Structures are given as structure tokens and as C-alpha cells.
Amino acid sequence: MRILLIAVLFLLMPKSNAEIPGCDFFDTVDISKAPRFSNGSYLYEGLLIPAHLTAEYDYKLLADDSKEKVASHVRGCACHLRPCIRFCCPQYQKMQKSKCYGDMSEDELNKHDPFVNVTLSDGSVVRRHFKEDLIVQSDLAKPGCPRMYFLNHELPGNEFTLFENGSLLRHWDKVELSKREYCVQHLSFKDDSIRIAPHFCPLSSEHSRTWKTVAIVISLICIILTISVYLYVEKLRNLHGKCFICYLASLFLGYFFLVLNVWKYSSGFCVTAGFLGYFSVMAAFFWLSVIGIHLRIKFSLASNCLHRLLPENPFRAYNLYAWGIPLIMTAITYTADQVVKNEKLRPRVGVGKNCWIYTGDMTVMIYFYGPMLLLIAFNIIMFVLSAIYIYNIKKNVKGLVHKQQTNQQINDQQMFAIFLRLFILMGLSWSFEILSFLLTKQQAWARALMVADYFNWSQGTIIFVLFILKPSILKLIIAGGRQNLPGSHHNSRSKAARYNSTHTACEGSIADPNAYC
């Protein structure tokens, strides 16, 4: 309730400075010195920018989406009206060894080639003068690296395509760079020519992206294999197993949309993919909480009273909870994205060519990381309560040799161990993800938390190893999915007697589907 109240108060607060709705900072230019008309419009480089595409800014956005405080100035969304070209330095300066030098001499201007090829949205290629036909952006922050590489399109393997929307495609590795990731500048070449050449950071980020993709794809394959085993092995298709499958399905969808975003394959339906990815990740957390809730219920009550707390069809109730609440959260996030006027409080799904919820500032804590932290805290409570129960049971039955009590203790411990594994796996990995977000501007911490990122991307692989590559599960797979798990060799008469004594069906657990109720 407090978080909701704080969010409402934030929405009601007046904006400290306006931003242009629907316009990325990297699509704007500084128009402070341009003539202003009485209707609020500006005339910039022969382009009339209407009042609704202008706003006052008191910051400069850096390549990593962090903000640097600067003097208040007016910016216009010129790139929505005419194609822009993003320069590294002032427009008439040259660049050598990643540094900007003074303006070109008259002789250099005479031999300089001022034209660039621009690919339009219909696929046609036109030749444009950088100054006369395009809007020059020269006040944006350079890509965040001390040394940049450049492309000489006259050399084999150095071809590139500059698109009308400002993005640049490197042909040799098919990577499309946004205006945050590259800039162009006049450059002297060995043949004594001066041409406009794109500059970009070393490819470590691309290598990281490749390894990220490898880790996620392997996880996706392992999730499919894990789901297949749980569907194939009859003994695993109990209530816990079904909840586990739903958890894996939502985790699969979350990773699927994440890898699409990494390689920009979802750009055609960017906003839709962002909301679907958001829903999937939230659903995975709620299904993890379902497992914790159900185990807590089993630990809290005697088995003959279990049916009094659970609804007649608990799996249906769990589905309503674990899919329904994330759906409501997604609807709220979508509504906020449409109606909230303060740009700093909008989720901004799909902003900056990133087909995910915007993570460039603390707003993500309201819509994404905040709910995630609450669910992690809830699961910690479930874990502590279950641990206390296990401890008390172990203490109470110490010295007893009654077989059913001993087996009950073993089964409870097995179920708790499963929940503990899942909690540590997902809770810890996403906790590191949130920590990584909070410390993203501190390079030393960012490097240290890189291993946590790979741990997060490899969740599906770890689940497969922990839950499938076990002797008991492998034995069931080899036996055709019908053999009882080890430790379940009780005759049918004793099982029937136990069933009648408890008056309720035994759901079993992920670890041991034949566990006592």
C-alpha cells in the first residue's frame, strides 16, 4: 500500500523539466540559438520545428543512458521531421585517433567529399549532402570508449549501410548500431582523400552479446528438455510437477523474448515483445511463489486436513493466481505507458530501440525490479517458515523409528530441498541482476557482477542438471517413465491403507512423486 501511495504521489508531482513525448534524446538537437516564433515553433537549419516537438532539458544523455547535469537549454525533435546524421565532433572538424581536431582548412574543404549514401525506408539508396540535405547532430555524447575504430567503405569487408532512421548496419557481422553506439566524422585516408566515416567502439560488447546468446539458447534447449521429461515421466505429472512445468514455460518465454531483443529480431513488434517478455518474467516469479505456497501449506497442516485449505481444484486456483496477477500487472504497466505524462515515471517499453522495459533510471523499480524484490522477500519468508518446520519435525521425531513418520520427514525434507534449489537459483540470480542495475555506473562492480549475469542467463541449464541429470530421474526415463522412484517400493495395499486413512490424494513432490501426504 505504501509503494502504491508513493507511486501516486510521484504521478501528481509537477515535472522539474519537460521532455518531448515519444522522442528519444538521441533524436533531438540543441535549438537554443535558433529563432523562435510567437506560436512556440523554432526555425533550425531551414527546418521549422513545431512547439510540441520542443522542450527544455537540464541534462545530457550519455551513451550508456546515464544523465549528466548541464545548463538548461531547449531541444527540438528534428530527426522526426528530417533524417539526421550523428557526428562525433563539431561538423567541420576532423577526427584522428579517436580525437577531434580543429576545423578543416580551406584546401581540405575543397577536396573533402561531403556526400553520404542513405538507405530510405523503402529500401532505395540516395546520395545526400551532410549539411544541405540532413540535420547534423554534433552535440550528442560520443560512444563510451576512449578509442574507436572506423570503417573505410572502399576496402573489402568495410561496407556499411546508413539508414534514414539514423541506425548503421555493419555488413561484415550484420550488426545494426544505434546512434548511441556509433558516430560519423570527417577522416583523412591514405589516398589523401577526406571522407565521412563511421566510428564505433571495440567489439567487446558484440563478443559479450554472442556469449550471452549462447548461454540463453543453451538454457532454452535445456528448458525444453526438462519440460519434455516431466511430460514423459508419468510419476512427475503430479501437482508439483505441473506447477514446475508452468514455471519453466514462463521462464522459457522470458528468455525467448530476451534473446530476440539482444539481436533486434523483435524490432518489427518491439513494444509487443517488450510487454510479453515482462509478463513472462513476472509469471515465472509468481509460479515460483506458488511452489513455495503449496509446500508451506503441506508443511503447516496435517495431511488429513489439507483438503480443507486447498480448493477443490488447487491447480486451477494456482493458474488463476500465477497467470492472472502478472496479466493485471502487465495491463497496469501498459496503461501507465500510455497515460502517464511525466516521461520519468513511464515504463517506456520499446524506447531507444530496446524491446524491453526501460532500465535507464530508477523508474524500473516501480514496474519491474520493485515487484520482483517483493516476490523474492515473500519467498524468503516461505523458505524460513518451511525451514523452521523441517527443524521442528526433525527434533520431534528424533529417536522414533516409526516408518511412516520417518518417511514423512524424508519426503518433507525432499520437497523443501527442491523449493530451496529453485529459490536460490532464481531469487539469487535476479537479486544479482537488480544489484547489477544499481551498481551499473561503477565499473569495478559491473565487471565483478558479470559472472552473475551469466549465472542468470544459464538458469535453464542449471535446472536441467539439478532436476533431470539425477540417477532416480534417469532411471525413470530409461524405464519408459512408468517405474517408481527409488524409495517408493511399498505395496499397493499399504498405499491404499494410507490413502483411506488420510481421505485425500497424495500430490507428491517434484523430488519424489510417490511421497506420503
UniProtKB/Swiss-Prot annotation:
GO terms for molecular function: G protein-coupled peptide receptor activity; G protein-coupled receptor activity. The keyword Transmembrane helix applies. Keywords: Cell membrane, Disulfide bond, G-protein coupled receptor, Glycoprotein, Membrane, Receptor, Signal, Transducer, Transmembrane, Transmembrane helix. Glycans are attached at N39, N117, N165, N456. Residues 1-18 form the signal peptide. Residues 234-242, 294-319, 385-414, 481-517 are cytoplasmic. Its main location: membrane. It is a multi-pass membrane protein. It holds the Pfam family 7tm_2. InterPro entries: GPCR_2-like_7TM, GPCR_2_secretin-like, Methusela_ecto_dom_1, Methusela_ecto_dom_2, Methuselah_N_dom, Methuselah_N_sf, Mth_GPCR. It is found in: Cell membrane. The chain crosses the membrane at residues 213-233, 243-263, 273-293, 320-340, 364-384, 415-435, 460-480. Residues 19-212, 264-272, 341-363, 436-459 are extracellular. CDD domains: 7tmB3_Methuselah-like, Mth_Ecto. Disulfide bonds join C23-C77, C79-C84, C88-C183, C89-C100, C145-C201. Belongs to the G-protein coupled receptor 2 family. Mth subfamily. PANTHER family: G-PROTEIN COUPLED RECEPTOR MTH-RELATED. This is Probable G-protein coupled receptor Mth-like 4. The gene is mthl4.
